[in-house]
Amino acid sequence: WEPVPGTDKYYFHMFAKEQPDLNWENPTLRKKLYDMINWWLEKGLAGFRIDAIINIKKDLDFPNLEPDGADGLAGCWRMVENVEGVGEYLEDLKKNTFEKYDAFTVAEVFNMHKDELSQFIGENGHFSTIFDFSAHALSNGAHGWYDAPDINFNDWRKTIINSQLQVQKC
């Protein structure tokens, strides 16, 4: 959370403070985003890389989370890990922008289950493709990459092959 100068208000940012998280619950904001994307597509841009898109839906109850790190803070990822409805926003984004222009999209989607892959890519997926984080997930310890375990080459290889086989099914 970052204070808004000159006010008693704060804004949330999962990444750099110069990158405030946007309130995708707000239909006016979504329309403005779609207008900006379409502006670029109308100029002839052929596609978009979309980072951290899976984080657009938050638990707006903003619960007090138990600290999970040595610093006494709770990981911000816990605000997005079990939230329902992100797919509705992603489908709305696709229909109002990328689909109209047959634009190529590559999205950063992590912590996804194998059975959800076809929702994200393929004929009816939200995006043209996604970055494959399956091998990266091997480096997650109890606190993410902070306490990452060593990665065994055979596990890495098996993970990559399994991931590619799943993609081919979409």
Protein language model annotation of sequence segments:
Residues G47-A52, F104-E108:
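A structural signal for short, well-ordered beta-strand segments and their strand-loop junctions
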Residues Y34-L41, G87-K94, Q164:
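Short, well-ordered alpha-helical packing segments
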Residues L90, K94-C170:
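Conserved alpha/beta catalytic core and glycan-binding cleft of carbohydrate-active enzymes
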